Amino acid sequence: MTDKQKSKITLMTEGNIFKILLFFSIPLILGNFLQQMYSTVDSIIVGNYVGSQALAAVSSTSMIVTVIISGCQGIAVGAGVVIAQCLGAKNRRNVFSAVHTSLAFSLVLGVVLTVLCALLTRPMVESMNTPKDILDDSVTYLFIYSFGLIFTIFYNMIAGILNASGNSKRSLLYLAYASVINVVLDLLFIVVFDMGVAGAAIATNISQLLACIFSLHYVMITKNECRVYLKAILFHKQMLVRILRMGIPAGMQNTVICFSNVLIQSSVNVFGYETIAGYGIYLKIDGFDILPLLSISLAMATFVGQNYGAGCIERVKKGVICGLIIGVIYTAGIGIIMLVFHNPILSLFTSDREAIHYAYLAMLYFCPFYGLLGFTQVFAGAIRGAGKSLVPMVVLLFSFCIFRIFWILFALPVLNNFEGVLLVYPVSWAVSAVLMTLCYINLMKKLLRTA
């Protein structure tokens, strides 16, 4: 039996808390860095070898893609929390049921969303006020990209299973392989074969397919409670209900929040393709802070899920403090780095000075306030890990969706400029940080009383 096949479940119910969280979070953070590299490399190569209009076309569809993927990732997080709780309770039968039900659901969801996205590509792009001069390229990119959704969704569910078992390094490894392949294929399809935005979408799809194959192969040969058997990928009714009860609030939360960002993107689109390109450039950079932070939130949910399942409430409290230290230092640190090195970073994407100007403007409004998101996401992960996924859903829907929609409808017409669009983010982050902190304090009081 190889070392690979002897892989063990990593339980977080004992040992040094800070060390456990840090070493579990690092592969997740790096994994999200690599996942963000998929779209970032597309943008860099498209911007430099095809042009600013093509870059704007890819950027204008990014929010649609994010809505779909984020919703599915929310469900994967919910499944991961259920698996983590079953592992913490040392219930092997429920672990087996949760793993295979999660994969069955992700396959069905992947097929449905792939078909819907392919059929509705043009109406979705047109609904976002996409300028006519980039409309066709936007439709082409999103249509081709939609056929890779099933691979992305299935991979994210497998990664959720690996992360729930404490094996975040394995999903990082496969993302590293896929990211290198993505860069090579981007250069081949865009630079050599001159395939434009279509080449970027095809390269991303192939890379995601390979990540899916690599990770599936691993979970089929591993020798632990999370081993996958193809014939056992079926729905277990009671477990499906439990997973959906946990995953749907997180999925809806992500989807609706991202939908509000689609409205914001639509507001940006009216300012022309150079503003779209600049805003799109910054969103790619922004992903290197936001997505890894979501990984820290996932680590928090996994840690709390296992310890809550084992009844270790005091350990939960200490773990959340450690998570806050990691989350706030990371987000604030990345924000500072972005501001200090803004010129070389932004120049990677394009030589268009107008696009770079708008990207830097977004950076000035976002980077100084990233620390607020550290509080929001760490507390959200902790609350979700305790099985209370409805609470962070309500808080984030209010802060990141309802508040932002009201801003777009009432504040933006008064401000009537690009800066008015940008300002909604730091203000909504502050609202969410305050509300989520209060909810976490209330939760801990209840848990400590019943411990």
What is the predicted function of each stretch?
Residues 12-50, 63-78, 82, 107-114, ...:
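N-terminal transmembrane alpha-helices
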Residues 40-43, 115, 157-161, 183-188, ...:
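Alpha-helical transmembrane segments of multipass membrane proteins
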Residues 23-42, 144, 178, 207-211, ...:
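Transmembrane helical elements of multi-pass membrane transporters/channels
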Residues 50-63, 138, 142, 201, ...:
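Small-residue hotspots at the loop-to-helix junctions and early N-terminal turns
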Residues 37-55, 125-132, 188-195, 255-284, ...:
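Helix-terminus/linker motif at the lipid-water interface of multi-pass membrane proteins
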Residues 1-25, 83-148, 192-248, 304-369, ...:
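Short alpha-helical transmembrane segments in multi-pass integral membrane proteins
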Residues 55-115, 152-171, 265, 278-341, ...:
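Small-residue-rich hydrophobic transmembrane alpha-helices
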